From Swiss-Prot:
Organism encoding this protein: Gallus gallus (Chicken)
Family: Belongs to the Wnt family.
GO biological process terms held by the UniProt record: camera-type eye photoreceptor cell differentiation; canonical Wnt signaling pathway; cell fate commitment; cell population proliferation; cornea development in camera-type eye; embryonic camera-type eye formation; embryonic forelimb morphogenesis; iris morphogenesis
Chief place of localization: secreted
Pfam families per the UniProt record, alphabetical: wnt
PROSITE patterns in the record: WNT1 (PS00246)
Gene3D superfamilies linked: 3.30.2460.20
Glycosylation (residues): N111
This protein's name: Protein Wnt-2b
Disulphide connectivity of cysteines: C101-C112, C152-C160, C162-C182, C231-C245, C233-C240, C303-C334, C319-C329, C333-C373, C349-C364, C351-C361, C356-C357
Secretion signal span: 1-20
Keywords: Developmental protein, Disulfide bond, Extracellular matrix, Glycoprotein, Lipoprotein, Secreted, Signal, Wnt signaling pathway
SMART domains: WNT1
Length: 385
């Protein structure tokens, strides 16, 4: 049975026809520069608890997180206190996946912007159960897996090291090889990420929790999808008669690219009648698989600043005059038009290598037009704030 005290807060989440209590469900929220501890405590005391506060580990030290952030559930707090070195990796991973999110959405109206001095990191935009929230939960979970697995292989953590199962001989399409080197222990990264990240969602049984759990799993599995076999050849003149191989994670960009494609193909769902799973909102679409991102609510258009939706708007954003894609001025500026400014850029050019060990370049100036989206009319902006 779904938790009744979390009903009716989010009219945008639909449920399949059925019993009356399977109505609407609430939504969940989720880097900032270093700030003093008293301010952090005041900030946290005034912030709703329903968020992914662990995202803020990228901005604060592990000790402060463990002791003072109320958004962590007991299991997360226990893991944080027991494995402070892993929390350090989680913090570094948070910075990495946020950068990747911003790279993937750099040409979109919503550009994965973060809020300074806000431990929810993304603000109210994560309250809506949108495809943007689906992407953020997936890539954040993937980021934890990636960061912990990498730290294991680099010998930075007490609890793990290289994959202990990759020993002896094995075979691939090229023939037999010996396991050697240091295979990335991705299964440990997945297990810890699941235990830590999913802990909060498992405390409740509502629609948003199920959505988050599903998308968290998509993110974890995305990292594993891009494990690659790397080998070193042995033999006369490197003839590769013998090979030593190990499993290594690919660059995190591949995971980001993959999840971006999943974002574009995300499937809108509604809760089934007994509240234990999903069904597609539109019967003309296929059912979601374990590798699909799912969401409940349509996204706002992100055209104008809307504090209630967490939208910063697109006024002042740089756009591409000739593009017909999401970075094009027509799409990015939502039909409001754009301003053009001529600017002079200084770049390095005519670079030459000088013996030994120096590259010398000239500085060249060129003039380019920069197009930025116009602000909405005052009345239009006031309607959204």
């Amino acid at each position: 049975m779904l938790s009744p005290n979390r009903l009716a807060a989010s009219p945008g989440i639909a449920v399949a026809p059925g019993r009356a209590e399977c109505g609407a469900f609430p939504r969940t929220a989720g880097a900032a520069p270093r700030i003093c501890l008293p301010f952090v405590l005041i900030l946290l005391a005034l912030t709703p608890r329903a968020d992914s506060s662990w995202w803020y580990i990228g901005a604060l030290g592990a000790r402060v997180i463990c002791d003072n952030i109320p958004g962590l559930v007991n299991k997360q707090r226990q893991l944080c206190q027991r494995y402070p070195d892993i929390m350090q990796s989680v913090g570094e991973g948070a910075k990495e996946w946020i950068r990747e999110c911003q790279y993937q959405f750099r040409h979109h109206r919503w550009n994965c912007s973060t809020l300074d001095r806000d431990h929810t990191v993304f603000g109210r935009v994560m309250l809506r159960s949108s495809r943007e929230a689906a992407f953020v939960y997936a890539i954040s979970s993937a980021g934890v897996v990636y960061a912990i697995t990498r730290a294991c292989s680099q010998g930075e953590l007490k609890a793990c090291g290289c994959d202990p199962l990759k020993r002896g001989r094995a075979k691939d399409e090229r023939g037999e090889f010996d396991w050697g080197g240091c295979s990335d222990n991705i299964n440990y990264g997945i297990r810890f990420a699941k235990a830590f990240v999913d802990a909060k969602e498992k405390k409740v049984k509502d629609a948003r929790a199920l959505m988050n759990l599903h998308n968290n799993r998509c993110g974890r599995m995305a990292v594993k999808r891009f494990l690659k076999l790397e080998c070193k050849c042995h033999g006369v003149s490197g003839s590769c008669t013998l090979r030593t191989c190990w499993l290594a994670m690919s660059d995190f960009r591949k995971t980001g690219d993959y999840l971006q494609k999943k974002y574009n193909g995300a499937i809108q769902v509604i809760m089934n009648q007994d509240g234990t799973g999903f069904t597609v909102a539109n019967k003309n679409f296929r059912k979601p698989t374990k590798t699909d991102l799912v969401y409940f609510e349509n996204s706002p258009d992100y055209c104008v600043m809307d504090k209630s939706a967490g939208s910063l708007g697109t006024a002042g954003r740089v756009c591409n005059k000739v593009s017909r894609g999401t970075d094009g001025c027509e799409v990015m500026c939502c039909g409001r038009g754009y301003d053009t400014t001529r600017v002079t850029r200084v770049t390095k050019c005519e670079c030459k290598f000088h013996w030994c060990c120096a590259v010398r370049c000239k500085e060249c100036e060129d003039t380019v037009d920069v197009h930025t989206c116009k602000a909405p009319k005052r009345a239009e902006w006031l309607d959204q704030t």
